[in-house]
């Protein structure tokens, strides 16, 4: 799927609109092929959050909230702790685009 800059911006705004009202969400970062390709295969969304909920329940919750976006392009969502997140994969996420900060 080829996206125009306007379509890409609209999808970014839609991701934020779907997740910003969740009280635990602190930061949303988009990364991966969505940023670097004219024809991305999906949208990778890292949600930095402060919640005691487990990874699976948060991932399912965010996937449900992001269904309007997923109807246009596949979505991969990764909930991460706002503090203490570490690892090599985090470096790739940090190279992404921050689209929301609370």
Task: Report each predicted region and the residues it spans.
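Short, well-ordered beta-strand segments
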Residues: 44-46
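Catalytic core of pol beta-like nucleotidyltransferases
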Residues: 1-29, 35-40, 49-102
